[in-house]
Amino acid sequence: MAARQTALGALIACRKQGAWSDGVLKEYVRRDQLDRREAALAARLCYGVLQNRMRLDFYLEQLVKGRLRDLQPVVLDILRLGLYQILWLEKVPDSAAVNEAVEQGKKYANPKAAALINGVLRNAVRRRMTWREPQDLATRYSHPQALVRLLAGEMGPEDLEAVLAADNQAPETVLQANPLAGDPAELPAEIQAAGGSCTAHPWLERCFLVSGVGSLERLEVFRQGLCYVQDAASRLAVRCAG
């Protein structure tokens, strides 16, 4: 599937070039001409691997003979991508995740690497209910140990885990209507006409929760400046500042 190739390309760029994931993913989605559904899957895969990399590596260390750092980097990228689908994406059949990863191994590495990928991921399918789970919060939620220690000094263990878990959730897309460019009340209908979902934010005026649109740059209302992306936390900071 094209979405997996796009996601892998973005992961490779992030690793090799230190690329900003959001920027490179948008570039690759345009390059590969993904439709709305494929673009959404590519984003889920890319961000999912990046957000859960430490936990993915914890599991892979139980499946791979030898050290992960001895693997060809692109092979490790492919293993992470395949394992993420097996563990987090219920709608993706295990067989599809494994087979696509094997094909990526053949394309980006070599037949020997493809055989390793096949064995590791099939083993993951068999063992995922019996392997060891990470006990430390840094690994479980794939956050830097130093950050976890810092947060632990500011809050109790239950709040700490809740914050780390929330930080790993897929963020909502929030659009701020531009009242100088058009009527904010018309924004939901425009986005719904383009095939997306758009509802008023529950506690931020002129803000809307949007999903199912793929790349926002495809929306006419976005290109015309009728709305722009603004995270809810950023908007709250403005309100608090008066």
Task: Describe the function of each predicted region.
Residues 210-242:
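SAM-dependent Rossmann-like transferase core, predominantly class I methyltransferases
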Residues 1-218:
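Class I Rossmann-like S-adenosyl-L-methionine
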